[in-house]
Curated annotation (Swiss-Prot):
Main location, first listed in the record: nucleus
Organism: Arabidopsis thaliana
Cysteine disulfide partners in this protein: none
Keywords from the named record: DNA replication, Nucleus
PANTHER family in UniProt: DNA REPLICATION COMPLEX GINS PROTEIN SLD5 (PTHR21206:SF0), SLD5 PROTEIN (PTHR21206)
Protein name: DNA replication complex GINS protein SLD5
Pfam families attached to this UniProt entry: Sld5, SLD5_C
Amino acid sequence: MASNSEAGGSADYETLMSTSDVELLKRAWRNEKAAPEILQYEGALVDRAKEQIELVEETIEDYVENGIDPLVVSLYQMDLDRAQFLLRSYLRVRLLKIEKFMFHNLNSEEAERRLSEQEKVFATRCADDLAKHFEETVLLKLPENYQSVLKQSLISEVDDMVPQPHLDTFVVCRSKNFVSLNLYEEGESPETVEMERGDLYFIRYKIVKRAIESGQIDLI
C-alpha cells in the first residue's frame, strides 16, 4: 500500500505535467528545424518552459531528499530531460540560422522582427566580427570598388553577396484543418491546393509559409 507521501507525489506529478507547453515547444522546434528561414521567436513559450524546468528540478531535489518513490522521481527526470532537450535544440537551431543568414536577418525588417533582443545582439556581433575579419584579411587588399562585404562591387544595386534562405525549398507538412492555398504568387495563376486535416503534403515552403505562421499547418 502506498504511503501518503508517495501518493501525494503521484498526484503532484499528474498536476505538474498536465500541461501543453512541452507539446507546444516540440511543435516550435519541429517547425524551426524544418523551415528554411528563421521563424518568429516563441518568447512567452520559452519563458514558461524555463519556469517549468526550474520547478521540476526543484521538485526532483525535494523528492530525493524526502525519500519519495524512485519511480516517481524517474518519471520527473524523464520529463525534465525531454523538456531540456527540446528547449536547447530549439535555441540551437535558431542560432545556427542566425549565423548562416546574419546579414539577411539584420537587413530584412521581417526577419529582424522575428529575433529576440538577445538574438539581435548575437547577430550584430557575428556580422561585425565577420566584416572585420574579411576587411583585415581580404577586402582592404582589393580595389576600392570591391571592398564591400555585402555587394560584389559598388555598382551593384542590391546586396548580391548576402546568403538568403531558399523559400522554394520543398518541405513536408501536415494541416490541422482544411486549408486552401494559392500555388503561385499573386497575379501569376489562380490555381490552388486544398489540404485536408491530418494529411501529409510535400510542397514548396513559400506556399505554406503564412499558414505556418498562423498555426494552421505544422512542418514535419
